């Protein structure tokens, strides 16, 4: 099954690599239109996944990741249209020149080929990845979680029908719909056809791919994100940033998980924060100084464990740690962070610069919410993943991250001397 799927994807990638930008944009436009026209059918299939999730006792955070609404579907269609508006990186000349030998040489962006994406309970990823791969001339094999089987099946049907309407091979976008986990292992070994594996999910999925794949793997997505409130920060504004970073959509990987507060302002700042978040159902996890302050402020708080400081909650749980100064904050991030997104709230330009220079993360923020680490927010269009590694791509992966390059050398029957 996967051998045939891989060959079909490779053949489709050969065709996609030769398409003009206009041809690719035409297909994307049809996909966006079909997402809207087929919305009732898509939402009906998604409702089946939601009902099964509830029956199986999945968490509210996971169900939120599964859920498609009319508004979310419209947003997904808009993301596809935004990808249409973005510059096509394929064929772009990165650099070049003429050598002493007379050979003209250029480095030109090219598609990667075939992308394999393994993801968990996020049906929106199906469209995000498909649209970015199509724009960059890549074929894609998708493997969603069993929790999204109905949603993914209908979304793939919509995309493949749109491809055929555009006169393109439907096998440019394929999905493994069988929930058998052995097929994941087979996909990870399909290096004859697949050029890159991109996992989107928890740490367990990323570890599985790293350990078993014979194909290069993009690692990332696990976000134990921190925000450090330094003593010079505007406390009232800081509270709104923390509210946004924690409560806007807690299930995402760019959500704040651990709040670091400088010791000298903790007794003043934390009660204000608790009061502001009183209606948001935030559960705090803290120890020593922070634990005592939060208890006195009437917060729903329990003692934090070492394991929880490394945990991506994906919920309204929030770790709170009081630190002595910026050095202690940076050291805490070095010990517990996942190199995803880290933020400092401060009025000091010098301390902001120190934080930027010393914190090792894909995205570092000054006086802003970590929720901005997103392909759409960064102007990249729908992202295929957020990479926390340093090779090939880092941070939100947009169009350029799905390309490689080739050296194009032109001579006049030139030979090497």
Swiss-Prot record:
Keywords: Amino-acid biosynthesis, Cytoplasm, NADP, Oxidoreductase, Proline biosynthesis. Its main location: cytoplasm. SUPFAM superfamilies: ALDH-like (SSF53720). Gene3D superfamilies: Aldehyde Dehydrogenase, Chain A, domain 1, Aldehyde Dehydrogenase, Chain A, domain 2. It is found in: Cytoplasm. GO terms for biological process: L-proline biosynthetic process. The keyword Oxidoreductase applies. Its EC number is 1.2.1.41. GO terms for molecular function: glutamate-5-semialdehyde dehydrogenase activity; NADP binding. GO terms for cellular component: cytoplasm. It catalyses: L-glutamate 5-semialdehyde + phosphate + NADP(+) = L-glutamyl 5-phosphate + NADPH + H(+). CDD domains: ALDH_F18-19_ProA-GPR. Pathway: Amino-acid biosynthesis; L-proline biosynthesis; L-glutamate 5-semialdehyde from L-glutamate: step 2/2. Belongs to the gamma-glutamyl phosphate reductase family. Catalyzes the NADPH-dependent reduction of L-glutamate 5-phosphate into L-glutamate 5-semialdehyde and phosphate. The product spontaneously undergoes cyclization to form 1-pyrroline-5-carboxylate. This is Gamma-glutamyl phosphate reductase. The gene is proA.
